[in-house]
Amino acid sequence: MMAETEGSVADDRELITREGGIGTKSPWKTTTSPVETIDAPVMGAHSWPALADAAQQPRPKNPPAPAPAPPSKNIPTSIPIPTPAVTGQAKSKGGGKANPGHKNPSGRHSKPGPRSNQNGPPPPPYLVHAVPYHPPPFPPMVPLPHAAGPDFPYAPYPPYPVPVPPVTESGNEKQVQASPLPPVLPAPQGDPGKPWPHQRGFDPRNMPQGAGPRNFGRPPFMGPAPGFLVGPGPGFPGPVYYLPGPPPGAIRGPYPPRFAPYPVNQGPPILSPEKLDLRDRVLKQVEYYFSDENLENDHYLISLMDEEGWVPTKIIAGFKRVKAMTMDVDFIVYALGFSNSVEVQGDQIRKRDKWSDWIPASKKSTSAETIGDGDKDSPKSITSGDNFGNPSKGSSKPTVSDFSSEGAQSSRTNNYKSGNLKSSADEKRNVEDLSNDFSNTFLLDEELDLEHRSPRKSGLSMSKSIEYEDDDMAVDDQDIQKLVIVTQNSGKSDGAGIGGTEAKNIPKELASTINDGLYYFEQELKKKRSGRRKNNSHLDTKDGKIKSGEGLNTKLGENSAANDGGEEHGIITSRRKQNKGTHKHHTAHARRFFSSNIRNNGNISESPPSSSIGFFFGSTPPDSHGPRLSKLSSSPQCTLSGSSPPVGSLPKSFPPFQHPSHQLLEENGFKQEKYLKYRKRCLNERKKLGSGCSEEMNHLYRFWSYFLRDTFVLSMYDDFQKFALEDAAGNYDYGLECLFRFYSYGLEKHFDEDLYKDFEKLSLDFYHKGNLYGLEKYWAFHHYRGKEEPITKHPELEKLLKEEFRSIDDFRAKETITNQKENKSH
């Protein structure tokens, strides 16, 4: 800077000398007037160093200034002290006085270059002046400050550089300060230019309420432009600019943007060829189950359907063929999703089209047995605990409760009508898959013994066999020998089942399932029995082949079921005829299961049984106590005449099986026992404990009341009447009440003149003894018969019904008065 200043001064003096006509001289020899020396003294001039010394001294470090030039060879090493003239000029320059040479800057530009100090840097080609600062017409764009939340882990961006005008003036060695910037408002939060010395990790708990990291950064709002400076003119909107969104790094908000990748769509799972083959096989198997071809013969599957045709998927998964392929229920449901003939809903499946054609008759009947034994009466009936139903003749809404309780069977209609299910004697099932296991589960031990050990089958000819397809069927004592009782409470008289377990109440839905299971199982036994007869129509003998039943058609069963107990028939049996055994009844789809009724809505004289009971006709041949024996009976492998059977004296449990009824029977403690043995055990218990003290006898009364309504057996009816009257004589009326219910409902189903006369006689007799229950059932029988052919009434009974007992309320009022009198007497 010193050398440059020195060269400028020399050039100026040379210019002045030329303009004044003076020759070129060294400016160091020119003297100034004393006046200037006196007027413009320079402070500290005496302490100035020599020019040569000053040029050799290093300059202070100043990045904007260039390095000092080396001294010229023409300049002597020792430079004299500048004269006062030089001092005055320097003063004039430094004091701010105008230099005459600076008034015409154009002359300087015309110069080709300085003529002295050739080794110095050339002067700029133009005269440098300080550029004045003009503020922009709009406020400067100030970047948004860094607004960071608490515990924000990222450092703020550095401040944006702001351009400033030049800060130095040409020809002046003194540095000029930068022009001040427009005032900037302080940041709302913190100082954006000051980094945080200590920053903690990001803690989501310190996040401001209502704010949080966003998945995608929102681009800045691109609204209409602010308009032109002078306006585009009235009536025209400003232009709208649409710009692409900035890159993610340029978006600055209270939090850095977080970008989540788009989820990758994996698509449907790709099954292996083995899985695809398994899916097709499962689908084909289940579709076959629900095909019309299979349903025509598959009564078991039909029994599993509910009122809408649905079958639980778990049950289908438990079938042998399906279970052998897979036990994954979810995979089965997945496979059925590709079916066109089977539909899936939740955990149930059914036939897609025409499923209503295969609903079991017991679940789609239009006149279900929904009314209790006392449904002819008011639900307020207090005469019997079984009178809990509400009378509703001709109920049109069938429910599964039709087979759920003590009084669940209405005598208005018979739900089991022939033809409701497609079944016949010639129908055959796939015994390899279901029938064998299904039948073997229910066979008694003696049946299994005969099935597995005997190479030849018995050729005994039944005098009258049970043909379930016939609309009219004759049942006699011979058939009773094949009757099997299914009891829930056996061997105990305290209400607990076998082994001390309490009898469980059977829900309505499960009771219907058990009922259907017992019936269809009975059909399976019949088919197996028919198949055995065909295969063994001829037996090999030494003399040749003879018919197995030849000469053996002697009627068996002369020892009636009543004789097993050694009891004598006496009351109202003298006028019974043996043709009563040919009483015709339709039992093609008769009820097989009677669930317990634990509700007691009246002042019954005793507690009704709390356990359920059922039955089916087994295939066990009768005990060999007849005069003639078959070859099978005389075989060493079979029971000898007069000996006790090897098993069957005690109830047998049901092995577990996939059929729902089997599992329910096992879980609820049901046992199977031949009727004749069960009857004998009940009578022995009654004799031991006394009338009214045997719970098993109560079950037997209840069974008789239901069974005889559909299948009349004379010997069974005689037992029923005899023991009920004996208990009533001992002030125990449960058996008698069961008998009256049998009369009322049974006669409405199948009217019989002899039974009707017994009904009238017993009703009148017990009315005179103060018991209104028989008269009430007699009134209900006539009241609910409707407009059928009138029946002649007993004169005294007809008078009572016309004068005193015209409605059920009259019975309730009479019963209340009787109870009040009894309470006062006590």
UniProtKB/Swiss-Prot annotation:
Entry's Gene Ontology BP terms: heat acclimation; mRNA catabolic process; mRNA stabilization
> What segments bear the compositional bias annotation Low complexity?
600-619, 640-649
Looking up CDD domains in the UniProt record yields: LAM
List the Gene3D superfamilies. Answer: Winged helix-like DNA-binding domain superfamily/Winged helix DNA-binding domain (1.10.10.10)
Q: Where is the composition biased (Pro residues)?
A: 60-83
Q: Which domain of life is it from?
A: Eukaryota
**Which residue intervals are annotated with compositional bias (Basic residues) in the record?**
527-536, 574-592
Where do the segments described as Disordered lie? 1-128, 366-428, 527-649
Its annotated compartments are: Cytoplasm, P-body; Cytoplasm, Cytosol
List residues, modification Phosphoserine. Answer: S378, S381, S465
Biased composition range(s): Polar residues: 380-423
Domain HTH La-type RNA-binding, by residue range, is 272-361
Q: Tell me which PROSITE patterns the record gives.
A: HTH_LA (PS50961)
Q: Biased-composition ranges for Basic and acidic residues?
A: 537-548
Cross-referenced Pfam families, in alphabetical order? La, LARP1_HEAT
N-acetylmethionine PTM sites in chain numbering? M1
The UniProt entry, under InterPro entries, shows: DM15 (IPR006607), La_dom_prot (IPR045180), La_HTH (IPR006630), WH-like_DNA-bd_sf (IPR036388), WH_DNA-bd_sf (IPR036390)
Sorted UniProt keywords: Acetylation, Cytoplasm, Phosphoprotein, RNA-binding
One GO CC term, this protein: P-body
Q: Give the similarity note.
A: Belongs to the LARP family.
Q: What is the protein's known function? A: Required for acclimation and survival during thermal stress. Heat-specific cofactor of XRN4 required for its targeting to polysomes and subsequent rapid degradation of seedling transcriptome during the early steps of the heat stress response.
Q: What is this protein called?
A: La-related protein 1A
> From which source organism is this entry?
Arabidopsis thaliana (Mouse-ear cress)
